[in-house]
Amino acid sequence: MTQLSMHSPVGDLTLSQDDGAIVAIDWGWAPMQSATGLLTEAKAQLDAYFDGALTVFDLPLRPAGTAFQRAVYDVMTSIPYGKTMTYAEVAQKVGSVARAVGGVCGSNPIPIVIPCHRVVAAPGRTPGHRVAGTLGGYSGHGGVDTKRALLRLEGADGPGRQLDLNLSMS
């Protein structure tokens, strides 16, 4: 496995690849790095995403996980840039429940590229004891503030959208 770290508006990221596919994006900086063509391309695509110039990633991905987790990852990658889907909507697509989908989102090994930040709680719900409102949680660096920043970057709270990114998450 090889890794490449990069700075981003939501914190330092370390990209990992193995056998020609991206297998992880972790928060933080890796002490040992080795740039490969794939990692350089992944960094370029992430830079373009953060600059607002890329809305669809085109990278080979191989996230670890069960068949259920991979099914949830597939649904998440189908959510268009700037759009959101509720945990319950994702659950319906994979024949499960919202809480299980939330668990998969929380263990997503390739955040941003597999856009778990686009999965939100249903309006008017209070999911779990840690979060309230319509955003749901976010286990990545910076928590819900990072989720909010990614959704704002994508314009998910723009005119005609029903997502309120100004919610208090306490």
Residues of each region from the PLM?
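Basic nucleic-acid-binding alpha-helical/helix-turn surface characteristic of O6-alkylguanine DNA
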Residues: 1-96, 145-170
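Short, amphipathic alpha-helical segments
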Residues: 95, 110, 140-144
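DNA major-groove recognition helix of helix-turn-helix
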Residues: 105
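Major-groove DNA-recognition helix of helix-turn-helix-type DNA-binding domains
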Residues: 108-114
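Hydrophobic alpha-helical packing residues
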Residues: 116-117, 150
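Short active-site segment of divalent metal-dependent hydrolases/proteases
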Residues: 120
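DPxDG-like acidic metal-binding loop motif
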Residues: 123-135, 139-145, 151
